[in-house]
Amino acid sequence: MGYSGAMSTLLSLRACLVLPLVLTALGACATQTELRRAAQQEQFARESASQGDWAQAMRSYAAAADNVELGHGDFAWQARLHHQAGRAASGACRYDAAEFHFRQAIALAKKSEHSSALSEKALESLQAGKPCGVPR
């Protein structure tokens, strides 16, 4: 093998070693970006809820929950966001969405070994037909 062939092999080997490290670093940056975005969306959702804009709060909490999942955030945070999305959906009279988010919150709370009692109670209250426009 000549000098140029050895150099070519060495460069290929180096690229094979460096590429996974670069891809891992980019993945970590993407994860942190998703989690930061989730925190911002959660804050926006809180502001919307405080102004009584339940539909926007529901969308923002749901988007935050999606970003926590994409960013590999913990199950407890995802559960809390889904619970809040369920409450906001209930306030917006979107019972189908509320039920979905409460069920997601219950499943995620169990995965995180945290209590799912609040979401279970909210789901029961939803099924009991409490008045529309009142968050659970």
Where are these regions (language model features)?
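The tetratricopeptide repeat
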Residues: 40, 74, 81, 119-122
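Bacterial Sec signal peptide processing site at the extreme N-terminus
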Residues: 23-44
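Residue signature of alpha-solenoid helical repeat architecture, marking inter-repeat boundaries
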Residues: 35-36, 76, 117
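Amphipathic alpha-helical segments of tetratricopeptide repeats
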Residues: 62-68, 104-108
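Flexible helix-coil transition and linker loops at the boundaries of alpha-helical arrays
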Residues: 30, 67-75, 110-115
